[in-house]
Amino acid sequence: MNYFDNKIDQFATYLQKRNNLDHIQFLQVRLGMQIIVGNFLKILVTYSISIFLSVFLYTLVTHLSYMLIRYNAHGAHAKSSILCYIQSILIFVFVPYFLINIDINFTYLLALSIIGLISVVIYAPAATKKQPIPIKLVKRKKYVSIIMYLLVMILSLIIHPFYAQFMLLGILVESITLLPIFFPKED
């Protein structure tokens, strides 16, 4: 166990005793804290590297666009925490880093984003085993995903093309995570 896990266990035990939580509630509290700390550390590492490479703003634009769609569309997750770190750094830091030095035609990115929209229309929301989506929310999440995707695309036509490419990158990455190839076949 590392330092953070020990502190999480100590605090979860304290909350269990103080609030008279049963073992299941204790495990839920501990898991919630582990997720919060893990996500905070991933964000800290990713954005620290982006600051070091002077691409913080581009990372932020890409990540925010991605999250606007991801919140309702869901999608595939990395198989492990370390893979999540690697994927986050590659997608949200290094791709924008290289994108600022490569002249990619905006029309090409827009065309790819339209293909991504098709992915969102067909596959969103994409549930996982660990994060199933209640049936009553599926239709609403699909509509919101499509609307948010279209809004980001429209906004990308209005703002400066340099920043728009990072917005399109974010939504394109999210649309890729919805594809069935990233979900294992269920038995």
Swiss-Prot record:
EC class name: hydrolase
Role, per record: Essential for the production of a quorum sensing system signal molecule, the autoinducing peptide (AIP). This quorum sensing system is responsible for the regulation of the expression of virulence factor genes. Involved in the proteolytic processing of AgrD, the precursor of AIP.
Protein name: Accessory gene regulator protein B
Family membership: Belongs to the AgrB family.
GO cellular component: plasma membrane
Compartmental location: Cell membrane
A Pfam family reported for this protein in Swiss-Prot or TrEMBL: AgrB
Transmembrane regions listed in the UniProt entry: 49-69, 82-102, 106-126, 144-164, 166-186
Topology in the lipid bilayer: Multi-pass membrane protein
Any GO molecular function: peptidase activity
InterPro entries per UniProt: AgrB
Origin species: Staphylococcus aureus (strain bovine RF122 / ET3-1)
EC number from the UniProt entry: 3.4.-.-
Record keywords, A-Z: Cell membrane, Hydrolase, Membrane, Protease, Quorum sensing, Transmembrane, Transmembrane helix, Virulence
